[in-house]
Amino acid sequence: MSYNHKNVLDTEQFSKSDLDFLIKKIKDMEHLVERHKAFGILTGKLLASLFFEASTRTRLSFEAAMERLGGRVISTVGFQFSSISKGETLYDTMKMVEAYADIAVIRHPVEGSSRIAAGAVKIPVVNAGDGAGQHPTQAILDLYTIISEKGTLDGLSVAFIGDLKYGRTIHSLINLLRHYKVRLYLISPIELALPDSYKKGLEGYPLTLEETTDIKAVWECDVAYVTRIQEERFPDHKEYERLKDLFKINKELILASKKETTILHPLPRVNELSTDVDDLPNAAYFRQARYGVVSRMTLLCLCLGQDF
């Protein structure tokens, strides 16, 4: 099949056949990187890295991906270093970026901002996180990580632990997992439960869903996806302080599981995932970060119409 998505804005845009194609192409890219490390598929192409919200991993992952493909990067980090701080609209900023770059990657604190950005320009736009909305490239690399670690998706039980209300990585990955025969366990405080809009979006798909506040439900799961409590999204800091330490994953909890539960985390972590888990063979979050580069290399090529 061919890839027909110029932009990567949310996970709803991908069908099951799109995902099957992407997983195959990411595997192909992984093999290429193992042999050559870097190559010139995107020589002469320029990526605009527009991060108006804090990021280390995602920004460096995209920039490393472009550099490994032979392309180059121009960047801006934070509102204070951009003309937006002077009152320029995102639309006008994107029109200027279009004059400089062949593709834009944008992170922005306002949900839906990537669609505004894409609507302003003809170059491809990739959403690297829009507020509490979505983070589609993280979801694609997470999906690839699960398949790489477990060999399949169908039949797996996957736990999402922590901030399911504001966690955009969770929102995005759940939208992809709905295409597979999986059992989802949503483990969170009631106050941070998955929004109803996302649960409604799962209706009619082959997965099953269970919500609980019991952290020991992770013992029933093949995969545990742990996230930090999103302090920056809370309107009331006291509420954050009350909830931040309710769910913690440590080695003792994981070793008590009946299954060899693979542990994922989009990072950064605070104190929801103990460092004593790091030396377990099923702690996959650092491998997950490595999969991110080849996943984004693949998406950059496909968005620019460059097959490999």
Swiss-Prot record:
Record-level Gene Ontology MF annotations: amino acid binding; aspartate carbamoyltransferase activity
EC number: 2.1.3.2
InterPro entries named among the record's database cross-references: Asp/Orn_carbamoyltranf_P-bd, Asp/Orn_carbamoylTrfase, Asp/Orn_carbamoylTrfase_sf, Asp_carbamoyltransf, Asp_carbamoyltransf_Asp/Orn-bd
Annotated binding of L-aspartate, by residue: 86, 168, 228
HAMAP family, sorted: Asp_carb_tr (MF_00001)
Subunit-level organization: Heterododecamer (2C3:3R2) of six catalytic PyrB chains organized as two trimers (C3), and six regulatory PyrI chains organized as three dimers (R2).
Protein name stated in the entry: Aspartate carbamoyltransferase catalytic subunit
Species of provenance: Leptospira borgpetersenii serovar Hardjo-bovis (strain JB197)
Name of the gene this protein is made from: pyrB
